[in-house]
Amino acid sequence: MSLREVPLRTLSGEPTTLADLVGDRAVLLVNVASKCGLTPQYSGLVELHRSFGPRGFSVVGVPCNQFMGQEPGTAEEIQQFCSTTYGVDFPLLEKTDVNGDQRHALYERLADTPDAEGNAGDIQWNFEKFLIDRDGKVAGRFRPRTTPDAPELIAAIESVL
C-alpha cells in the first residue's frame, strides 16, 4: 500500500488518506505542536504551502502530544490556535502518536526513512518533516531544526514538483 493510501483522520475526525486530502500533490508531512520552541515554524510552513501549492504541493500538519506534552489542546483548540496565530490554511490531521507502541501506521513506515546523515528510527521531536512525492514515496526526511526556508528543504521540494 502506498503512503498515499494509509488510513488517516482529519483534525475534525473524518476518515481520509493523503490521496483524498491533497490529490496527487507532493506532500510535506510535519508533526506539529502549539507549545514548542519550534512552533514559529508554522509561519514558514504556511509560506511553503502558499508558494508551492500552485505547482502541486501541500503541507499537511500532524499534531502530536508525545514530546513534553506540547500539543495538549483539543481539536478545536488546535484549529483555533493554528488559524488565528499563524493563518494555517493547510490540512491538519487528528492528534497522532508518532513513536512508541501506539505509533500510527503511517509513522511506522516513515520512521524507517533515513535523514541526510543516514539516521533512521524514531521521530526526534516536534516539527520533523517528511517529503512525500506524487507517487507516495518518501523523497526526504528533515530533522526538527531544519527550518521551512532551509535551502536543502527548498531544493528537495523543487525536485519533486
What do the predicted segments below correspond to?
Residues A105-E108, D112-L161:
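Thiol-/selenol-based redox modules, centered on thioredoxin-like
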Residues D24-A26, K35, T39-V62, S83-Y86:
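Conserved helix-turn-beta segment immediately C-terminal to the redox Cys motif
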Residues V6-A26, E47-F52:
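A short beta-strand-turn-helix
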Residues G56-T74, D89-G100:
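Thiol-based oxidoreductase modules, predominantly thioredoxin-like and allied folds used
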Residues P40-S43, P72-G73, H104-A105, E152:
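Generic recognition of short, well-ordered alpha-helical segments
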Residues E76-W125:
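Short, internal strand/loop/helix patches
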